[in-house]
């Protein structure tokens, strides 16, 4: 059976926004895995909406801030997960989930990798520090991204 991995840094994202994609993948014969920080539910008080969906969940100790050392642990956990499961597809969301998943996928030769950018942190009017940090990181990570999905025109134009 083919395997797909969905990655977000906070749990709750998939049941809130991605269930149609999960159903499509499952109907295409994929076993769907979800890597997230389930200790940090978002878009709801708990992770009960994942029960009965057939999604296989994996705890990854993501932190939202890119400056937290715990994200090194999260990267290692993701890399190990990818090595153990040999995923046929990785679809990542959220800035930290997207960054660490793309690095881990590259270093484990896992792919293709899809990244959905739900609004870059560098945009017209954003603080200069955002441009100094996030823009070069995203430019670097773009080489490890097979498909980039942008949800707004400004991000799409910038990504081209």
Regions found by a protein language model. Give the residues of each.
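Gly/Ala-rich phosphate-binding loop of Rossmann-like dinucleotide-binding domains
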Residues: 22, 26, 102, 106, ...
């Amino acid at each position: 059976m083919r395997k797909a991995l969905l990655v977000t840094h906070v749990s709750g994202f998939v049941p809130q926004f991605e269930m149609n994609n999960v159903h499509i993948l499952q109907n295409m014969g994929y076993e769907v895995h979800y890597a997230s920080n389930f200790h940090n539910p978002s878009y709801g008080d708990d992770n009960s909406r994942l029960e009965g969906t057939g999604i296989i969940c994996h705890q990854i100790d993501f932190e939202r801030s890119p400056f937290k050392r715990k994200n090194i642990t999260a990267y290692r956990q993701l890399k190990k997960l990818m090595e153990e499961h040999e995923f046929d597809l990785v679809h990542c969301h959220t800035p930290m989930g997207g960054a660490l998943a793309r690095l881990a996928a590259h270093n484990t030769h896992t792919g293709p990798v899809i990244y959905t950018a739900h609004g870059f942190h560098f945009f017209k009017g954003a603080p200069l520090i955002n441009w100094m940090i996030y823009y070069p990181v995203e430019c670097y990570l773009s080489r490890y991204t097979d498909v980039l999905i942008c949800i707004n025109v400004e991000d799409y134009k910038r990504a081209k």
